[in-house]
Design a protein with these regions (language model features):
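Short loop->beta transition adjacent to catalytic acidic/histidine clusters or analogous donor-positioning motifs
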Residues: 1-3, 24-35, 43, 56-59
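Short, well-formed alpha-helical segments that are part of the catalytic scaffolds
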Residues: 12-25
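Acidic helix N-cap motif at the loop->helix transition within catalytic regions
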Residues: 17, 42-51, 73, 93, ...
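A conserved acidic beta->alpha catalytic loop
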Residues: 37-46, 65, 89
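Glycine-rich, basic loop-to-helix element that forms the pyrophosphate-binding segment
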Residues: 63-80
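Short aromatic/hydrophobic "clamp" motif used to bind/position activated sugar donors
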Residues: 85
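Donor-binding/catalytic cores of nucleotide-activated saccharide
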Residues: 90-192, 202-216
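Membrane-interface aromatic/basic loop that binds lipid-linked glycans or pyrophosphate carriers
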Residues: 111, 258-282
Length: 282
């Protein structure tokens, strides 16, 4: 079983070498590494090109303009050749046995998706590990368990490539994980979990998440809610009735009203704001 490791890289010159070397040093050896260089303005491009010269398992995909993580993942998957893929952010890293533990579970269960846990590494050395346990889910539990654990995270999973190609990727620049991973889980034959927490997520103070204000959070959570409502209305209304997505959407609408965003604030996100407004009115 070949695993493609898709690394999205944008202005992560302080972290990208650790990310790449952590995947190259995996105990599971049947891998390829696809790095998507998203028009960085720092030294990221130079670093990954040097790493690619040193290891022929690395393939670099270049964007002609900055497109964000959603596009990066999609283009990386299309350029990959593995049976399964995993996505890794350029400022994160993996423990050396992480991929092997997921592959072992995939071979044991035949699951289209196998998820590990995550370790959230914060500034100052503080960290927190979270995992789902060691279980296999099918039917509606594929989505309900994932949602119930409240860890909406895409990068700690190996996903069958044909499934990743099948599902449209959210290409917005913020809160893009959820509208993608939920449909992937729904389409999967089954979803398996392992207790390995070897995906290390760096809680970076300079990330887009930390730069968001209340209006931006509410806008993109609202768009995410609309995406999921549309998906389940088309595919599985019974699950939609069991998830709090409608109430989540209403909550975001209330926050937006309370924020009373200025024209200047709206103009920062004008295309997404117009999309949100149009979809709410329909």
């Amino acid at each position: 079983m070949k695993i493609s490791i898709i690394i999205t890289a944008y202005n992560v010159d302080k972290f990208i070498e650790r990310a790449v070397k952590s995947v190259l040093s995996q105990t599971y050896k049947n891998i390829e590494v696809v790095i998507v260089e998203d028009c960085s303005t720092d030294n990221t491009k130079d670093i990954i090109e040097q790493l690619a010269k040193e290891d022929n398992r690395i393939k670099i995909v270049y964007h002609e303009e900055n497109k964000g993580a959603g596009w990066g993942r999609r283009n990386g998957i299309e350029a990959s050749s593995g049976d399964y893929f995993i996505t890794v952010d350029g400022d994160d890293w993996l423990d050396e046995d992480f991929i092997e533990s997921l592959v072992r579970k995939a071979e044991e269960t035949g699951a289209d998706v196998v998820s590990g846990g995550i370790t959230c590494n914060k500034e100052g050395g503080y960290w927190e590990a979270t995992c789902y346990g060691d279980v296999v889910c099918d039917g509606e539990d594929k989505v309900l368990k994932f949602w119930g654990e409240k860890i909406v995270f895409m990068n700690n999973k190996i996903i069958k490539r044909e499934l990743g190609i099948k599902v449209p990727y959210c290409t917005r620049r913020f809160i893009e994980d959820t509208p993608t991973i939920i449909p992937i889980l729904w389409h999967a034959n089954k979803v398996a979990y392992v207790s390995n927490v070897g995906y290390h997520y760096r809680d970076n103070a300079n990330s887009l998440t930390h730069q968001a204000n209340a209006f931006k959070y509410a806008l993109y959570r609202g768009l995410c809610s609309l995406d999921l409502i549309d998906f389940f209305n088309k595919n599985d209304k019974s699950i939609l009735e069991k998830l709090p997505i409608q109430s989540m959407l209403q909550q975001q609408l209330n926050i937006i009203k309370q924020c009373k965003p200025s024209v200047e604030e709206l103009n920062k996100y004008i295309s997404d704001w117009l999309e949100f407004s149009k979809r709410i009115l329909l």
